[in-house]
Amino acid sequence: MTNMSWSFLTRLLEEIHNHSTFVGKVWLTVLVVFRIVLTAVGGESIYSDEQSKFTCNTRQPGCDNVCYDAFAPLSHVRFWVFQIVVISTPSVMYLGYAVHRLARASEQERRRALRRRPGPRRLPRAQLPPPPPGWPDTTDLGEAEPILALEEDEDEEPGAPEGPGEDTEEERTEDVAAKGGGGDGKTVVTPGPAGQHDGRRRIQREGLMRVYVAQLVVRAAFEVAFLVGQYLLYGFEVPPFFACSRQPCPHVVDCFVSRPTEKTVFLLVMYVVSCLCLLLNLCEMAHLGLGSAQDAVRGRRGASAAGPGPAPRPPPCAFPAAAAGLACPPDYSLVVRAAERARAHDQNLANLALQALRDGAAVAAVSADRDSPPCSGLNATSRGPPRAGGPASGTGSATSGGTVGEQGRSGAQEQLATKPRVGSEKGSTGSRDGKATVWI
């Protein structure tokens, strides 16, 4: 026991300190200070002579060893060392899982960062032949940025850093908090002292909550088991003498224990430390449960206060590509920012509506031209000379014997002929001396 080194276990427990809650850090302090230090320092000096000073009032060879085995089937110090190792095992296993998960997440983040590029993808510039003499040089014309890219870029997270490189731990923490976390956690941590010292939210963001609770339950079960075993083996005090009747002792002999009072006090201290660790485990489980319940209540209140969100924007491709005359190569998509895509979609809708109005106006103008009566000014020239012996037309001369209604209709036709058409592409040619107006 004098050469026992606790440095390895202490380093492991200090690493667990970085992935535990506030109550878990208190438990770790109690474990390191009151258990490891007391067992390594106090137990070494108190129990160093427990077998050498255990004497019996007989000279029978082997009787002392048999009686000491009956008095202490397992040494107090060895029992407590075994208890520390077993109780620390769930925490060490949790640490191994946490380190593996975080290392895997950082590796995935590094690969994702390597796939990111500082700008849009540029196609390799083709090697063009030199221009003929007299032509301008094409080397200063720049490179055309493509508008097409593979769809594998769509799975990249929005808001990612532009250049390649690995993010720091603080940036990844803020990133996950802004997205709503990873794993089982849904809470968003605000920057500040409260967010920095709350290990529960960090465990939720890292997706380690279930494993952390499982190791708490196992640790509490081990504490209860060792408390029961310590009571069954040693009771609550170390007696000053022990009556032994085992073979090869010739009769019932009395054996005497060295420093029984000091060992009794130390035994009671270890009982208190074990109960304190068990209480801290229960408090930590209650802290995790109440904290998760509070986060759920706050999330519901925030959702009810915010009210229903805005209606989702329709997809950019609201019209089929075949109807719009668009065709894209397979596995390709337009590289457009989210804001620009929405603005372009609205502009396309406005352009389509304006084009529909123009088409409707053109169709209405064509139908109006088909349904309009012929011009009255062309009657005299288009009909030709009157037939021989036929009656003169009511509108052919000023001295015709037509009725008043016919004269009114002829006047209306003349006004309609002289009025310009709506939507015609060319103007009209007319004369100021009263000649007929001809539309082209």
From Swiss-Prot:
Residues 43-78, 245-264 are extracellular. It is a multi-pass membrane protein. GO terms for biological process: cell communication by electrical coupling; cell-cell signaling; negative regulation of G1/S transition of mitotic cell cycle; positive regulation of calcium ion transmembrane transport; positive regulation of gene expression; positive regulation of oligodendrocyte progenitor proliferation; response to toxic substance. GO terms for molecular function: gap junction channel activity; gap junction channel activity involved in cell communication by electrical coupling. Residues 108-199, 368-440 are annotated as: Disordered. Mainly expressed by oligodendrocytes in the central nervous system. Expressed in optic nerve (at protein level). The chain crosses the membrane at residues 22-42, 79-99, 224-244, 265-285. Residues 150-173 have a biased composition (Acidic residues). The keyword Repeat does not apply. GO terms for cellular component: connexin complex; gap junction; myelin sheath; neuronal cell body; paranode region of axon; perikaryon; proximal neuron projection. InterPro entries: Connexin, Connexin_CCC, Connexin_CS, Connexin_N, Connexin_N_sf. Residues 1-21, 100-223, 286-440 are cytoplasmic. A connexon is composed of a hexamer of connexins. Interacts with TJP1. This is Gap junction gamma-2 protein. It comes from Rattus norvegicus.
